[in-house]
Amino acid sequence: MKKAAAILLAITMLFLVGCDNGRPETTPEPSPVAVSSGDCYEVSMLKNNDGVEKYSYTVKTHDGKVIESAICANKPKVKPLNGDLLGIRFYTDSDSFVRYYDIKSGRVSASYFDAFWDNGTLVAYNDFEKSEKLIVRDIFDDNGYRYEKEIKSDSLTLIVTKAEPTDDGETLIVKFKLGEHGAEKNVRLPLVDKDSDGV
């Protein structure tokens, strides 16, 4: 009985380790698997031998120049906004942020935490954690259009539930709650600078 157990154990070890010319064979790292792609971007899943998943992403210009390429812990979500602009939402353990990529010129925007609306030119986001404000601004130009609306509250959180532009495209109507169980409120954020000839 002991001999049979020893033989069985030896065979099992051979299957587990594997051999190549008398040396243990290492298990290769798995290849990346594309989970999302387009003309100018690709998101791939990487899984190591321990089963831990990570994601890589690459964004390129129309002519193939790499704008940005990196690895992140959570799967990013890509949203093409038009033929020359991508928005990518990245997720942390407790938050999310969006970065925009101009795939024609190669520009990359700042990271907008808690972004909840965009139209290809402007982005609206909740800056409540830092300054209790809702902000709408130019995606790329720090000196471009910017409007801030202060929201006074004792609540620690502001949750945007809906954001829609008016039919004329000049105002963004934002519905939000202060805290998880707060009553829903509305605020209007202008999308056009009335003091100039446009955005």
Question: What label would you give each PLM region?
Answer:
Residues 28-35, 71-81, 110-125, 155-165:
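Repeated scaffold domains used in trafficking and secretory/extracellular systems
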Residues 20-22:
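Bacterial signal peptide processing site
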Residues 34-51, 82-93, 118-129, 134-135, ...:
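Short beta-strand elements that form the blades of beta-propeller/WD-repeat-like
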Residues 28-69:
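Long, hydrophobic/aromatic N-terminal blocks
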Residues 52-69, 92-111, 132-155, 179-199:
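Surface-exposed loop/turn elements that mediate protein-protein interactions on large endomembrane-trafficking
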Residues 2-10:
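Sec-dependent signal peptide recognition
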Residues 15-18:
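C-terminal motif of bacterial Sec signal peptides marking the signal peptidase cleavage site
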Residues 72-100:
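Right-handed parallel beta-helix
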